[in-house]
Amino acid sequence: MTHIIIDGDACPVVDSIIDLTTETGIFVTIIRSFSHFSNQLYPPHVSTLYVDDGPDAVDYKIVQLSTKDDIVVTQDYGLASLLVDKVLIVMHHNGKIYNSKNIQQLLDKRYMNAQIRKQGGRHKGPPPFTKQDQKVFEQSLLKVIHRIKELD
């Protein structure tokens, strides 16, 4: 059964995922570190799992829990690279789907930017997340959900 796992520490589309999966039979797990604790109540198909605040603790838990039928939503290219051949789909919150063809290019870009920062340089960061970005993500996730439902 398909399950969506969210890298929840800095994910701007958590509410969209929850709304779009209501009444689909798809369960959602939000994984966060304790430093991002929230008392927010979610619908019955959503659970939240908290892990220690250590570096990459959320990533390790996602790798541990994910299965071949899962969809993972993360903006972390390193985590995506670990999951791209393990799970059904790995998505960025901008709606793009990671795959074995594009992940290496993204990792290379991340490495080059890290090298620039080490040398005291600067590079342009990502633009602010907009309502249009959210709509693009929602359309992409809906396509994924419809495709999965067709396979069931």
Swiss-Prot record:
Disulfide bonds: none annotated. Pfam families: DUF188. It comes from the Bacteria. Belongs to the UPF0178 family. PANTHER family: UPF0178 PROTEIN YAII (PTHR35146:SF1). This is UPF0178 protein SAOUHSC_00689.
